[in-house]
A protein has these predicted regions:
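Bacterial N-terminal signal peptides that target proteins for export
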Residues: 2-13
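C-terminal motif of bacterial Sec signal peptides marking the signal peptidase cleavage site
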Residues: 21-25
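Conserved functional micro-motifs across diverse proteins
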Residues: 26-181
Length: 181
């Protein structure tokens, strides 16, 4: 038997296995509910993506727009913003989560606070069919970060107790997003 023929059979088998693996992955979407900032997570019919998170400075011109109506944070604490894009790819309006929570490595929990800012994500609001939050051409969508804000007040020590994990409730259970702090 020739050397070429000896190699042909294993190569053909390898090609067949690779083709089968590629076909089985077609249309695959992850059901992962633990992601890192920048990776989308699907909850029900909504796809949430934390596009950016950071501490906010009330004395900064850009940040002051995110903090409209908020009092000066107490000593030892600071405002923290989590900026989202949420997609509804379904044929029906979908309801956004009504609350958001951050956990630190010491298992302390911090609840999101209401915001009067034009950039605020509307807790419990609706996302129309085939639409997104922030709505196209809206203030948050055209702003510097291009996302809707969920606001937290965190102790200054929170940055020392990393990772910070954002919990988003969903119809089949919560998702967790590890924030890039």
């Amino acid at each position: 038997m020739s050397r070429t023929r000896n190699l042909a059979r294993p190569l053909a088998l390898l090609a067949l296995l690779l083709a089968a693996a590629a076909l089985s992955a077609c249309g695959y979407e992850s059901e992962e509910k633990e992601v890192v900032e920048g990776e989308p997570v699907t909850l029900g019919e909504l796809k949430y993506n934390v596009i950016f998170s950071r501490f906010l400075n009330p004395d900064d011109n850009e940040d002051s727009a995110y903090l409209i109506g908020q009092p000066t944070p107490p000593p030892g604490s600071a405002y923290f913003g989590v900026f989202f894009e949420v997609q509804n790819e379904s044929e029906e309006p979908q309801t956004l989560a009504e609350h958001f929570t951050i956990h630190d490595a010491d298992h302390q929990k911090f609840e999101a606070i209401e915001s009067e800012s034009l950039y605020a994500l509307p807790f419990g609001g609706e996302v129309e069919s085939q639409e997104q939050i922030p709505v196209l051409d809206s203030t948050p969508e055209t702003g510097p970060i291009e996302g809707s804000l969920v606001l937290f007040e965190l102790p200054a020590s929170a940055s020392e107790n990393r990772p910070l994990t954002l919990e988003i409730p969903g119809p089949e259970g919560p998702a967790e997003v590890t924030l890039d702090l």
